[in-house]
């Protein structure tokens, strides 16, 4: 008797290969995210009386700083992968093979979203100071595009066969080729598609933030920083429990897949960001209350 077993499987990481040019899914998805994010952020900027040109002006430096931050964060916590005999890697430069530091080879994988957020925030902070733009308002404008970009970008993990979870037999299970499986689970075929969980969760947050953004405008109750605080709370809550399923965490004092004897760095950062969001909402509420009291008095 034949039985049908449902599962999902990556078709590979390459979208298009022309010989002289290879376009990979991850890069394509990031490019799509940037274009969509640029369009959305410009519309949101206009609705809050911020010059939309500022979005175009910051975009190149924001992308670069986010990539540097995401890579640096990963390398710091996975330094054992890049030290000693692994410090150099081969790179084909116009048919000449040269040796470069392996931590530069970002195309080989290894970035972390929390590092990207740190790098991006520093870029935004500098930009707002140099242009005399209200920081919290400007971040609120960018946040919906950022979370949508995270939602779209997570599908790059699907095509790369990475960032999946522990073994499972659920109907939506992911088949992972043997070469991509953690050594601890080498005999398992199917795993939690945690990137899908996070992608869907992030998209729901995007819908929520956009809805609240325009409701704030319609009611003339714009509170700079409110959208950012909701993002910190919502994203961190989802990332915390999804991270608990993953087999490739960045660890402090422990080793994957479960950081035994240590701590999952993403969960630690999620707790910090979640708490920061709650504290931010508290102070926004407190400020609003004081303003009402002052006006009524």
UniProtKB/Swiss-Prot annotation:
Cellular compartments per GO CC: plasma membrane
Pfam families referenced in this protein's UniProt entry, alphabetically: LGT
Keywords, ordered alphabetically: Cell inner membrane, Cell membrane, Membrane, Transferase, Transmembrane, Transmembrane helix
SS bond partners: none
Top-level taxon of origin: Bacteria
EC number: 2.5.1.145
Pathway(s) this gene product operates in, as recorded in its UniProt entry: Protein modification; lipoprotein biosynthesis (diacylglyceryl transfer)
Record membrane topology: Multi-pass membrane protein
GO MF terms held by the record: phosphatidylglycerol-prolipoprotein diacylglyceryl transferase activity
Function summary: Catalyzes the transfer of the diacylglyceryl group from phosphatidylglycerol to the sulfhydryl group of the N-terminal cysteine of a prolipoprotein, the first step in the formation of mature lipoproteins.
Protein's recorded name: Phosphatidylglycerol--prolipoprotein diacylglyceryl transferase
Species annotation: Prochlorococcus marinus subsp. pastoris (strain CCMP1986 / NIES-2087 / MED4)
